Amino acid sequence: MADGPRCKRRKQANPRRNNVTNYNNVIEANSDSDDEDKLHIVEEESITDAADCDASVPEDDLPTDHTVLPENSEREGSTNSCWEDEGKETKEILGPEAQSDEVGCTVKEDECDSDAENEQNHDPNVEEFLQQEDTAVIYPEAPEEDQRQGTPEASGQDENGTPDAFSQLLTCPYCDRGYKRFTSLKEHIKYRHEKNEDNFSCSLCSYTFAYRTQLDRHMTSHKSGRDQRHVTQSSGNRKFKCTECGKAFKYKHHLKEHLRIHSGEKPYECPNCKKRFSHSGSYSSHISSKKCIGLMPVKGRARSGLKTSQCSSPSLSASPGSPARPQIRQKIENKPLQEQLPVNQIKTEPVDYEFKPIVVASGINCSTPLQNGVFSGGSPLQATSSPQGVVQAVVLPTVGLVSPISINLSDIQNVLKVAVDGNVIRQVLENNHANLASKEQETISNASIQQAGHSLISAISLPLVDQDGTTKIIINYSLEQPSQLQVVPQNLKKEHSVPTNSCKNEKLPEDLTVKSEKDKNFEGETNDSTCLLCDDCPGDLNALQELKHYETKNPPQLPQSSGTEAEKPSSPAPSETGENNLSPGQPPLKNLLSLLKAYYALNAQPSAEELSKIADSVNLPLDVVKKWFEKMQAGQISVQSSGPSSPEQVKISSPTDNDDQAATTNESEPQNSTNNSQNPANTSKSQTSSGGSTQNGSRSSTPSPSPLNLSSSRNSQGYTYTAEGVQEEPQMEPLDLSLPKQHGELLERSTITSVYQNSVYSVQEEPLNLTCAKKEPQKDNSITDSDPIVNVIPPSANPINIAIPTVTAQLPTIVAIADQNSVPCLRALAANKQTILIPQVAYTYSTTVSPAVQETPPKQTQANGSQDERQDTSSEGVSNVEDQNDSDSTPPKKKMRKTENGMYACDLCDKIFQKSSSLLRHKYEHTGKRPHECGICKKAFKHKHHLIEHMRLHSGEKPYQCDKCGKRFSHSGSYSQHMNHRYSYCKREAEERDSTEQEEVGQEVLSSEHAGARASPSQIDSDERESLTREEEEDSEKEEEEEEEKDVEGLQEEKECRKLQDVEEEEEVEEEEEEEEGKTEGNKNDDVVNRASNAEPEVIQSNGQVSEEKTNKA
């Protein structure tokens, strides 16, 4: 390497520059690199150094057997090459783009024809060079004088140009790199420009590389400086790139959180200080830190209220003067579980932010607190009549939900009455002033509640998680007066005194109010209960029912005047119209039915286009109209008003008829025993109420009189009612919705019939029970299969389960679940439960219990909140069925509702998942459910891998080991913390420990008194630092405790060793002094004994031995 300044050349007196005749034949040379490493980056770095080496080669050393241009051009090229080298350096700094231009092109102006000409001349010359076996030297063209002024060395250059080795360089025809040796040029072409299958080629500059890593490194030279900042050695693994800033991430969820920085979205909010976070990690750190201390549990975690019955719950007292005013729910995805909010905060809909009216109970005694997760008190809650419309609300603490949910007990009662009663749909909007415009759902009851009977709420459970992930609250609800609860079930045949209940006008979501039109005149009339949304229903399936289903999808389309759930599309409506049960709000229903029948009369078999037009004209969904036409064509719906207009028209069939018809129905389609029992149509004998309400005998003929079929799923295999089978139940009396009662042999031989209480709520003879009926499909079609089930139910076994889904934004009106494939509704707690879903309220009617369930009715009743702790932890109060089999015998796709894109959306927050299992695990965040429990210490975890790591604490397994210090870890988190934060200095600590141990061993041989003192400080410090890092790990608490105990034991042992060593040392020194002083042996022994009294017994023994030795010496 030349140490002196570059371009210091031998000067000649008479430089001649005008003899270069053909510049086109001259090939510019850049530089040479003797040590080519096959990498473009390294080649660039070596250009300058190689040029300096070549500059020192004297002219005399040049070979003589090669073709040489005239001497003048040789001298001219010497200085020119210097400037070319300088220009090359600047181009290297600028980047590869600048290198693409030939250096000579920057020098020549007028004397050089063009870049194209030079390139054209390169190829034949290079071919000629490649054919030669020796080195050819070519001298570049002479530069213009004024071009030199740009470089620093130019000022010091003499006019005399000097020939140098730069003129000897060979240029690559592909990339214009110069090489002094021909073999170097050949190698360069072979490794850089010769393409084959094994090489990796750059698409930008045609460079080839033997390894992909070389190509990746080379590609970074083409990136801009902004992009290169984010390029790392592991850039190949970062597949997810931000389109805004170009930053790349290894994982997609990291990119999602990063994008929130650009969008400004901050979905995580602290419930205490209201601070918002864009990253879940920041939110988690904030929650777990001690900075924001409020109502939140420690580290943001809380156990499920069902698991720990002693969880704190707010008192359910509400001020009678003011209604519960809901607050808008902020969108939080990972709030801490069981957040205790003020009583006036009510959970609103999370997804679409539509605000449903809050149910408000008038005059309800809400003073009793929740006990063991169940709202119960010494006396049941009573919804008494309150003409003043006093508004009180029961606020239930939700488990893992955003905020407590408010329940209006009186509205629940009214809606329940209306729902059970077929006349639900005849409701009129009267609370126009109570609107949703203010986003505060404040339902004001203007009309006084006329209630002769009392509604009793014996228990309100904490939220439960259904099999499909829906969170519900179960209310043990009884509509009878307390005196009537004593009635014996066998008194079924006696007419029930029907209390006159005019439901108060309640504002349902979408401004749909349900007003029970049950005037005292209509108390005795048949309930127009029909199968809601049930395709399997007989022809008298109420159009109302399907209309309800439609309303859930398109609530705004329903005219308010038609009633929230006017019975629209099906034939059942005519029966109701004939029975004068229709309220003024029902004429639209008549119009709809008359329109449908008119269309049917015109064309009994309309085409698809005509059906769509008909559906648009009647404002009903196409599938509903299509089904109605199909049933009309099948004869299941009579063209005339299918229901008898008067009680006299009711057809009465004998019990044998019922049996035969039930048998045919069973043969036609297998049924769940639960469905059979719950099918209102199967009601054996119900008495006509005092009002003389009639029951429709043939369900097919009279759609409205048939009781509501509340079967929750098509899987439960409810009846597909044919015209013949539908008529199984000629019922002379209104449906008795109380518990199914044994009617002698009739019930024993017939399919289990669920006797629902009269729609007017006649006195129930038994208290309602919250036992959950377990799904048990009926394997035999014979009626006798249901016989054992009939007798299974204890007097109080027939509960009305009121399941209140905490979030049912998609359910604007009362909805009965019929088919889980088509109906986007919540399911009952057990798949066979018959359920009505009302905005924020789902009523589950369980009329019979399968034999498997009868053994554990108390537990199921307690499942509402006070159930046995073990069962709650496993099933979270959903049902025993889910505990036995997560798949729940239904296809997985039916368990979770899919969105349009096939994704699984959480109904408690806005998150969407690709797999149902991911959604199920996500639900644990809301519910606090921890399904994976340690069998040793009973600690539960949300994720299985957390349990696996926890089990290592018990087994002592430590699979993770630091390769530096050799320390082992049982948790991957502890190992990760160590590797991220302590790996840089953990080896030094290990060496220090080793050195101290060696010192300790050596000093034990010589003097062991100082070794322990030196070893302990480093050990203590390392252990303290280690414990600090491990505190961040949630599942390593036990490990920390064990290590701390070991540390304490070690310190105690060290202290004891020090004491022993100090005692021994003092004894030796004093004994020597005593020997010198000639003290007596007795004095020595006394001193030794006195000092040994403060030490261990071993020390005393050793002291005694020492004293004996000294005595011998003396």
Swiss-Prot record:
Localization of this protein: Nucleus
Pfam family, one: zf-C2H2
Keyword Secreted: no
Listed Low complexity bias regions: 15-30, 309-326, 682-716
Any one annotated GO CC term: nucleus
Basic and acidic residues: bias regions: 504-523, 1048-1062, 1079-1089
Short sequence motif CTBP-binding motif: positions: 767-771
Single GO molecular function: zinc ion binding
Zinc finger (C2H2-type): 170-193, 200-222, 240-262, 268-292, 904-926, 932-954, 960-981
This protein's record includes keyword tRNA processing: no
One GO BP annotation of this record: positive regulation of neuron differentiation
Chain intervals for the UniProt region annotation (Disordered): 1-105, 142-163, 304-326, 491-529, 553-588, 636-716, 852-898, 989-1114
Bias kind Polar residues: ranges: 149-160, 573-584, 636-681, 852-866, 874-890
The entry's keywords: DNA-binding, Homeobox, Metal-binding, Nucleus, Repeat, Transcription, Transcription regulation, Zinc, Zinc-finger
Tissue distribution: Expression is developmentally regulated with high expression in mesoderm, nervous system and lens.
PROSITE patterns reported in the protein's UniProt record: ZINC_FINGER_C2H2_1, ZINC_FINGER_C2H2_2
Sequence similarity: Belongs to the delta-EF1/ZFH-1 C2H2-type zinc-finger family.
PANTHER family found in the cross-reference section: HISTONE H4 TRANSCRIPTION FACTOR-RELATED (PTHR24391), ZINC FINGER E-BOX-BINDING HOMEOBOX 1 (PTHR24391:SF17)
Described function: Acts as a transcriptional repressor. Positively regulates neuronal differentiation. Represses transcription by binding to the E box-containing promoter. Binds to delta 1-crystallin enhancer core and represses lens-specific transcription. It also binds many other non-lens specific DNA sequences.
Protein name, per record: Zinc finger E-box-binding homeobox 1
Organism per entry: Gallus gallus (Chicken)
